[in-house]
Regions:
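Flexible, glycine/proline-enriched loop segments at strand-loop-helix junctions
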Residues: 103-104, 128-132, 159-162
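Arginine/glycine-rich "motif VI" loop of SF2 helicases in the C-terminal RecA-like domain
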Residues: 53, 119-127, 153-154
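Active-site/ligand-binding-proximal alpha/beta "capping" segment
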Residues: 88-123, 130
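A cross-family phosphate/adenosyl-ligand binding-site feature
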Residues: 1-96, 134-176
C-alpha cells in the first residue's frame, strides 16, 4: 500500500512533532507500506520521509518545480515527480496513493486534507483518510465541524469518512478500512 502523508513544512514547529512525523514514517515502513508525500526535505515533511526510508520503505515525492528552485526537494527520494502547479501535485499524490494521513500542519495541509475528504464524499475515490493528531492541534477544527453538522451544514455520513486518531498504530489501522 502507498500511504500519502500531508504535514507541515514550517521551519519552526515543535521538535516533538518532527520526531512524531519520523515515527509515522517508520511505522509506515515497518507495516510494509511505501510513502507518498510532498517531496520536501524540511520540517515534518523531511522527517516522515527519513523515517520511512531509513526503515525500508520507498519514498515517492511530488513537488512543484518552483520548490525545487528553492532547493527544498529531498535528494534521497526513491522517486521524485516534478510538476508545474500545486493542483498537479495534489492530483498526482491522489493518483499514486492508496490512503491518506494528515498530521498537524498549516493551511497547505488543511487544503490537501479537505480536498481529499470532499473527493471521498463525492465518490471520486474510496481511499481511507485519517487525521493523526498527537497534540490536539485539530481539536478546535473538529469542534467547528461538529458545530456545522449540528446546524445541518454538513451532510449525513461526511464525518464518518475520516478516522480521527492520536497514535501511529491507530492511523495505520484506519488505512485498512
Amino acid at each position: 500500500m502507498k500511504i500519502s502523508v500531508y504535514c507541515s513544512s514550517a521551519p519552526d514547529i515543535d521538535p516533538a512533532l518532527i520526531d512524531f512525523a519520523y515515527e509515522l514514517g517508520k511505522g509506515i515502513a515497518l507495516a510494509g507500506h511505501d510513502l507518498v508525500w510532498g517531496g520536501a526535505k524540511i520540517s515534518a515533511m523531511g522527517a516522515v520521509a527519513r523515517g520511512a526510508r531509513e526503515n525500508g520503505a520507498k519514498t515517492i515525492g511530488v513537488i512543484p518545480r518552483s520548490l525545487v528552485d528553492r532547493e527544498i526537494q529531498d535528494p534521497n527520494a526513491t522517486e521524485l515527480h516534478l510538476v508545474d502547479t500545486m493542483r498537479e501535485r495534489k492530483a498526482l499524490i491522489e493518483e499514486l496513493s492508496d490512503g491518506f494521513i494528515a498530521l498537524p500542519g498549516g493551511i497547505g495541509t488543511l487544503e490537501e486534507f479537505f480536498e481529499i475528504w470532499v473527493g471521498r464524499y463525492l465518490l471520486f475515490h474510496s481511499k481511507p483518510i485519517a487525521v493523526l493528531d498527537p497534540i490536539g492541534a485539530y481539536g478546535p477544527l473538529r469542534e467547528a465541524l461538529e458545530h456545522l453538522a449540528g446546524h445541518k451544514l454538513m451532510k449525513s455520513g461526511q464525518n464518518e469518512l475520516v478516522s480521527w486518531t492520536t497514535q501511529v498504530e491507530e492511523a495505520l489501522s484506519a488505512m485498512a478500512r
